[in-house]
Structures are given as structure tokens and as C-alpha cells.
UniProtKB/Swiss-Prot annotation:
Gene Ontology terms for molecular function: voltage-gated monoatomic anion channel activity
Known role: Voltage-gated channel that enables the transfer of anions such as iodide, chloride, bromide and fluoride which may function in counter-ion conductance and participates in Golgi acidification.
Membrane topology: Multi-pass membrane protein
Domain of life: Eukaryota
Subunit and partners: Homotrimer.
Residues listed as glycosylation sites in the UniProt record: N180, N243
Annotated InterPro entries: ABA_GPCR_dom, Golgi_pH-regulator_cons_dom, GPHR/GTG
Keyword Endoplasmic reticulum: no
Catalyzed reactions: iodide(out) = iodide(in); chloride(in) = chloride(out); bromide(in) = bromide(out); fluoride(in) = fluoride(out)
GO cellular component terms given for this protein: Golgi cisterna membrane; Golgi membrane; monoatomic ion channel complex
Name of this chain's protein: Golgi pH regulator
Keywords assigned: Glycoprotein, Golgi apparatus, Ion channel, Ion transport, Membrane, Protein transport, Transmembrane, Transmembrane helix, Transport, Voltage-gated channel
Species of provenance: Salmo salar
Length: 455
């Protein structure tokens, strides 16, 4: 009876997560597009629901909610479903919709979709060759073989996002990095934009007038010269056509310039708004957070470097280790085990909420940046793939943030994986991503004032 009640609780929560994923799809991702393929919406919502359920099971593990056998069953069931979706369903539909957008392959799109899926499976399986994740004890389609490969991709994505976020967050929040933008700078750039638009309009008028004159001149020549005039018009280009192509090239160059000026104007407006916002109480609060994140970023880069150089992986979770160091330093009586469990629960909860929120915000921005009416279905499925792999990898890495007694069932469910490898791999990619982001933001920050100083 208890297993049935536990299953009802899990099923109800999955329905709620599915509904939230459905609403997010409709209200955020597809609010500017017509939903033509409901299978995309269903696949995205299922991926979101089972991804969130894994985090729910981690919280239940710490709280001791549900029966141990029930939690183990739902861990296994959840992992098999999410792996089925990530390895079989989503890649197949990505291939199907990519092929559907190619006219030459319309008649055999199911066949070519299968070809795309088999290609994905080949490279997905070959991914295990250069990494120490394979285990000869398990079969080809065992859960360990699948999770290990999904984990490599997901941990790489997590490390890239974390490295960029650790650098970009203080850069975004701190007023120290803001350029000094005045109203006169914006007005000067807007004036240049308007002048460019006027030049485009005048040149397009010239093109229209020239084409009209060429058309009228051609009509007159056909009426006057008859058959020989037609032969001449075919063998020779009409007068003014060379000048017309030259003007069209100038228009194309001016339109590209106008696009750049428009983007620079929007950038200056946003910077000016950020300067005004930084003077408010909330802006000063985020400025303080920026300094805090700067210290965190430096510490994280330093620790990642230490872990890589000395091949080090923590044995205990950070909370327990931090409390032990503090208690030993202060020399006070303190129940480390009791409080580490509660603080770990709060920390894991914060990590879960911020991970889901941060990923959804990133996915929304990415979708609006590159989507179109034709590619939107493919992009949503790619985002679902990224989201699922990201959350599976979060469970792999979050295991280290849990006290030792709560790791056992997670370790048992995930199988005999090389957990230390994933932590070292995360440190390597995080360090590369963070240092690359520092270099990129430094060059962008240095180049921006020079760009706006040009007359």
C-alpha cells in the first residue's frame, strides 16, 4: 500500500512538472510562433518533467520521504525514461524535422531521419573511446554505459556555462565595468543612423527612377526599330545598367552600416540605463553582489587549478568539511553531523532552484537569438536535449554536495561510474571556459570605447 501511495505522489508531481514545462513552452518559447507540431511540445514537457523529478528525488533522499524501495524504483524508472528520451526520441525527431525542412528529401524523410539518428548513435557511442568511462562488466545497453556518455556531454555543457557565468556575472553586476555614456553620445550615433537611412532612401529612389527610365527607353526602341532592335537589345546591355549595379552595391553597404549603427545605439541605450540603475538602492545591492561573485570567481578558478595540478577530488561534501574546519578552529562543541544534514539540504535546494531557473533563462535567450518559423521546432528539441543532459549531469556532480549517508542510493542507481573523472573533467573545462571568458570580455570591453569614439 505504501508503494502505491508513493507512486501516486511521484506521478502527481510529474504531472505538475509536465504542466509547468507545457506552460513555459507556450508562454515563453513559442509565444511569438504558431504551434504546428504538438509532438515537439510533448517531448519538451516530458524531458522537463523527468529532469525535475530527479531533483525531487534528491530532496526526498535527504528528507527521508517515501519508502527506500519506492525511491529506488522511481530512481531507476526515471533514469530509464530520461535516457530513452535523450538517446532515442529527441535525436530521431531532430533528424526528422531537419529533413522535413529540405525539399529534396521530402518524399523519403522517414528514411533519412533514421539515417541521421544512426549517425548520431555512432558518434554518441564513439564518444566513450577517449574517456575512462567504459566498464567491461556491463552490457552494451546497460544504464551505466548510457549515463556515462550522457554525463560527458552534460558535464562539458555545465562547465562551459559555469565558467562563463562565473566571469560574466560580476562583469554584468559591477558598475566598475560600465562605460561612461552620455546623452550626447547617443544623440550623435542616432544622427549618424538617420543620415545613413536618408542616404539609403535617396539611392533606392535613384535605382527606381533609373529602372523606370530604362524600361521606357526599351519600350520606345522596340516600337521604332522592330526586329533588329529586339536583336540588339538581347545582345547588348541597356545604358545605365552598370551604374545601377554600382548604386545597388552602395545601398547594400549602407544597409549593413545602418544595422551596425542600430545595434550600437541599442547597446549605448542599454548601458545608459544600467548606469542609471546602478545609482538606485537595488543597483548598489547588485554592485555589492558583483564584488562577492568576483571573489568567488577567483576562488573557484584557484581551486579548479589546484584540483587539476594535484589530481585532487574531495572525499567529503563541502558543507561538512567547512563546518569541521570552523569548529576545530574555534574549539567549540557542535553537532557537525546534525547541522551538516540540514545545511546540505538547504544548499542542495538552492542549487536545484538556481540551476533550473538559470538554465530556463539561458534557453529562452538562446531560442530568441537564433530561432525562426522554420527552425523553431528543431531548436526547441535541441534545447530539450541540452536541458536533459544538463540535469542528468547535475545529479552526477551534486552527489558530491550530499553527505556520505545520502550518496549510497544515488551511487547504487547510477551504477559503477568513474565519479572522480567527471569532477576532474568539470574542473578542466570550467578553467578553460573561465579564462577564455575573461579574455573575451577584456577584449570586448577594451574595444567598445574605441568603437564609439569613431566619428
Amino acid at each position: 500500500m505504501s508503494f502505491l501511495m508513493d507512486s501516486v505522489i511521484m506521478f502527481t508531481s510529474q504531472v505538475l512538472f509536465f504542466g509547468f514545462g507545457w506552460l513555459f513552452f507556450m508562454r515563453q518559447l513559442f509565444k511569438d510562433y504558431e504551434v504546428r507540431q504538438y509532438v515537439v511540445q510533448v517531448v519538451f514537457s516530458i524531458t522537463f518533467a523527468f529532469s525535475c523529478t530527479m531533483f525531487e528525488l534528491i530532496i526526498f533522499e535527504i528528507l527521508g520521504a517515501l519508502e527506500t524501495s519506492s525511491r529506488y524504483f522511481h530512481w531507476k524508472f526515471n533514469l530509464y525514461v530520461i535516457l530513452l528520451v535523450l538517446i532515442f526520441v529527441v535525436p530521431f525527431y531532430i533528424g526528422y524535422f531537419v529533413v522535413s525542412n529540405i525539399r529534396l528529401l521530402q518524399r523519403q524523410k522517414l528514411l533519412f531521419a533514421c539515417v541521421v539518428w544512426f549517425t548520431f548513435m555512432y558518434f554518441f557511442w564513439k564518444l566513450g573511446d577517449p574517456f575512462p568511462i567504459l566498464s567491461p562488466k556491463h552490457g552494451i545497453l546497460s544504464i551505466e554505459q548510457l549515463i556515462s556518455r550522457v554525463g560527458v556531454i552534460g558535464v562539458t555543457l555545465m562547465a562551459l556555462l559555469s565558467g562563463f557565468g562565473a566571469v560574466n556575472c560580476p562583469y554584468t553586476y559591477m558598475s566598475y565595468f560600465l562605460r561612461n555614456v552620455t546623452e550626447s553620445d547617443i544623440l550623435a550615433l542616432e544622427r549618424r543612423l538617420l543620415q545613413t537611412m536618408d542616404m539609403i532612401v535617396s539611392k533606392k529612389k535613384r535605382i527606381a527612377m533609373t529602372r523606370r527610365q530604362m524600361y521606357q527607353r526599351g519600350e520606345d526602341q522596340n516600337k521604332q526599330t522592330g526586329f533588329w532592335g529586339m536583336i540588339k537589345s538581347v545582345t547588348s546591355s541597356p545604358p545605365g545598367s552598370e551604374n545601377l549595379s554600382l548604386i545597388q552595391q552602395e545601398v547594400d553597404a549602407l544597409e549593413e552600416l545602418s544595422r551596425q549603427l542600430f545595434l550600437e545605439t541599442v547597446d549605448l541605450q542599454a548601458t545608459k540605463e544600467r548606469i542609471e540603475y546602478s545609482k538606485t538602492f537595488q543597483g548598489k545591492y547588485f554592485n555589492f553582489l558583483g564584488y562577492f561573485f568576483s571573489i568567488y570567481c577567483v576562488w573557484k578558478i584557484f581551486m579548479a587549478t589546484i584540483n587539476i595540478v594535484f589530481d585532487r577530488v574531495g572525499k567529503t561534501d563541502p558543507v561538512t568539511r567547512g563546518i569541521e574546519i570552523t569548529v576545530n578552529y574555534l574549539g567549540i562543541q557542535f553537532d557537525v553531523k546534525f547541522w551538516s544534514q540540514h545545511i546540505s539540504f538547504i544548499l542542495v535546494g538552492i542549487i536545484i532552484v538556481t540551476s533550473i531557473r538559470g538554465l530556463l533563462i539561458t534557453l529562452t535567450k538562446f531560442f530568441y537569438a537564433i530561432s525562426s518559423s522554420k527552425s523553431s521546432n528543431v531548436i526547441v528539441l535541441v534545447l530539450a536535449q541540452i536541458m536533459g543532459m544538463y540535469f542528468v549531469s547535475s545529479v552526477l556532480l551534486m552527489r558530491m554536495s550530499m553527505p556520505l549517508e545520502y550518496r549510497s542510493i544515488v551511487t547504487e542507481v547510477l551504477g559503477e561510474l568513474q565519479f572522480n573523472f567527471y569532477h576532474r573533467w568539470f574542473d578542466v573545462i570550467f578553467l578553460v571556459s573561465a579564462l577564455s571568458s575573461i579574455l573575451f570580455l577584456y577584449l570586448a570591453h577594451k574595444q567598445a570605447p574605441e568603437k564609439h569614439m569613431t566619428p
